[in-house]
């Protein structure tokens, strides 16, 4: 016999089923109004849920790539009858970002985000408008633009030296090194010192806690993005699914960042607008500011910087080093270039990067094969036509960057690690189809900084160490997540090959 709780559960499932069925019939009637217009091809789907099972795959980018390989590079999918346009080829993606950039410059900010990232005041997910433009301008002028990057170059040099010394210490002790973890330390310390003039302490455990929160947030964000697909009538259910996790991560970041903000407010004249944090606090306190922001705006932005500016770079460094270890001929050529340009008496520097075209090509190739965000999601704000097909207003756009950058019609041997492709003029023109950091107005504003992090970190390891692993090849399996993550973290034994001159200047403590 069913218990009362079981009866309630069964009744709820029936209610959801019939609600979805009724909604499907209603949507079908609305869709009939577009009869006579050319609609995109749609692969076979399942009743009620449509193509949801492809997005719920642990490796959704590969599942969608296989779907496009079979049915075409431009497809119409349905998730509970909500329309989705899937793009999986370089030529189609290029056309969309060129012809429809403004129309797809916004993202939906669903209710489940209200309690995520210390409030709904996010920058990355904000609609394209005054607030988004204001925050992007601050990011560019104070952190990510060419002049800002030049001002903070010495900070990154300090952190790169610290990164090298940490690796050297482990090498001398013959300890294995988890490349992703060390790269994450480099990225987090650099971003924090560049944006707020301080880093997190290793001795107190503060740094380890922040890295743990970033990892938790990455996994949680993936869950939230997937459950956001379950729109009406399951809104209340989807909000409650991860409420406990959301509140824990959000409250933890809120506590951490509130403490930092209070510290800054006690010393208002110490930095005088030097760092992004100070400029944001000035705007927060200024009643006549160009755009009024709240404390949650400030906290949300720094959470996004930690998530988007650290884990993505660290994962790319790890993936690219794995490719170099598995392709020793490429590693040999790269080392020869670095030795000839930089030498053995000093550590590689940012100023060397323009003189190292093969290193730049290695970075591009690593990003091509392993884009940090394999799926890019936007929303068509208005109805339009694309390649002669009708696209309804509020249709979700999914650009499979993973598939785009392995498109065999654009890239020769698309699944092979061949950095030299970017040295050839013809392939350099094809690099316009390289969308590892997105494209258009909503492209990643931190792409230049990420390229610097990745290039100097890889350059340091190749210049200074021989790398060995257990077995002949690094396992290149992926694991599901917001970012493209290695299922088996790359661990190496490092053997010093050169010990370039390191200044006697004391590096700030972690």
UniProtKB/Swiss-Prot annotation:
It is found in: Membrane. The chain crosses the membrane at residues 7-27. Keywords: Heme, Iron, Membrane, Metal-binding, Monooxygenase, Oxidoreductase, Transmembrane, Transmembrane helix. The keyword ATP-binding does not apply. GO terms for cellular component: membrane. It is a single-pass membrane protein. CDD domains: CYP93 (cd20655). GO terms for molecular function: heme binding; iron ion binding; monooxygenase activity; oxidoreductase activity, acting on paired donors, with incorporation or reduction of molecular oxygen. Gene3D superfamilies: Cytochrome P450. Belongs to the cytochrome P450 family. PANTHER family: CYTOCHROME P450 705A20-RELATED (PTHR24298:SF541), FLAVONOID 3'-MONOOXYGENASE-RELATED (PTHR24298). This is Cytochrome P450 705A20. It comes from Arabidopsis thaliana (Mouse-ear cress). The gene is CYP705A20.
């Amino acid at each position: 016999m069913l218990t009362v709780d079981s009866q309630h559960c069964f009744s709820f499932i029936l209610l959801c089923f019939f609600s979805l069925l009724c909604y499907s019939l209603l949507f079908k009637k609305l869709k009939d109004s577009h009869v006579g217009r050319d609609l995109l091809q749609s692969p076979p789907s399942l009743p009620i849920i449509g193509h949801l099972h492809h997005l719920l795959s642990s490796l959704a980018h590969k599942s969608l790539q296989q779907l496009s390989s079979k049915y075409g590079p431009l497809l119409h999918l349905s998730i509970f009858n909500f329309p989705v346009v899937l793009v999986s080829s370089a030529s189609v993606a290029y056309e969309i970002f060129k012809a429809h950039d403004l129309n797809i410059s916004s993202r939906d900010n669903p209710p489940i985000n209200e309690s995520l990232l210390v409030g709904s005041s996010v920058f990355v997910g904000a609609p394209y408008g005054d607030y988004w433009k204001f925050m992007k301008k601050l990011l560019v002028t104070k952190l990510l633009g060419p002049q800002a990057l030049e001002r903070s170059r010495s900070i990154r040099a300090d952190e790169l030296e610290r990164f090298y010394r940490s690796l050297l210490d482990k090498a001398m002790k013959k300890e294995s090194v988890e490349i992703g973890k060390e790269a994450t330390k480099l990225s987090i310390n650099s971003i924090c010192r560049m944006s707020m003039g301080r880093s997190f302490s290793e001795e107190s455990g503060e740094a380890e806690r922040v890295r743990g929160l970033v990892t938790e947030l990455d996994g949680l964000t993936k869950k939230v993005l997937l459950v956001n697909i379950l729109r009406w009538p399951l809104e209340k259910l989807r909000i409650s699914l991860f409420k406990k996790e959301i509140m824990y991560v959000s409250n933890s970041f809120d506590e951490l960042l509130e403490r930092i903000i209070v510290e800054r407010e006690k010393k208002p004249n110490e930095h005088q607008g030097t760092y992004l944090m100070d400029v944001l606090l000035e705007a927060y306190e200024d009643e006549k500011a160009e755009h009024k922001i709240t404390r949650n705006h400030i906290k949300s932005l720094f959470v996004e910087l930690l998530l988007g500016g650290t884990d993505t770079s660290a994962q790319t460094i790890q993936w690219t080093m794995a490719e170099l270890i598995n392709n020793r001929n490429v590693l040999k050529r790269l080392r020869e270039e670095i030795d000839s340009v930089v030498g053995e008496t000093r550590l590689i520097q940012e100023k060397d990067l323009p003189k190292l075209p093969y290193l730049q090509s290695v970075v591009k190739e690593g990003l091509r094969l392993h884009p940090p965000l394999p799926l890019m999601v936007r929303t068509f704000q208005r109805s339009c036509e694309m390649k002669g097909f009708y696209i309804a207003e509020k249709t979700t756009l999914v650009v499979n960057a993973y598939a785009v950058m392995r498109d065999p019609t654009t890239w020769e041997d698309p699944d092979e690690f061949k950095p030299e492709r970017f040295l050839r003029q013809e392939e350099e023109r094809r690099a316009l189809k390289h969308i590892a950091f997105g494209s258009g107005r909503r492209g990643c504003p931190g792409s230049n900084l990420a390229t610097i992090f990745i290039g100097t970190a890889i350059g340091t390891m190749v210049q200074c160490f021989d790398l060995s692993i257990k077995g002949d090849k690094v396992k290149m399996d992926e694991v599901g997540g917001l970012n493209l993550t290695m299922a088996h973290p790359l661990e190496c034994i490092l053997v010093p090959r050169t010990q370039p001159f390191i200044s006697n200047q004391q590096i700030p403590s972690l």
